[in-house]
């Protein structure tokens, strides 16, 4: 069974986690300063930091949130993608290394030659692995400005789908700007 569960917006996270009822605003309303944060006891920046580290998925209130998210990522990288792509065990290990390497360095301007060399992935296979991770919802790709079929080949930057993944997989505290 395939089911796509989108992550929570910051507003949705606040409404669920704090029991609030914040309305949605247009970008113009936000940029013009017509939005007032109505809850004086909580500051948006503190709440936003909590959201970045562990508020994207609806199960954020689980006491074992990080372990559950790690398990989901592991399931996708070690089982779901390899089964879909008919990968062998060696390829699965390389896919896992790629995901871990990307989590350490996002946003990432891909240097395909370095990744291929460091991870032992062939030139023809690396774009497929990145596409699989994107299709699984783990990565977002920013395409390079190109024309024709070149647009399918070039990736300007690679981002993790959401910051919670970086907090779970990275060895250090992720840069908030990512």
PLM segments and residue spans:
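Accessory nucleic acid-recognition modules appended to NTPase machines
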Residues: 61-178
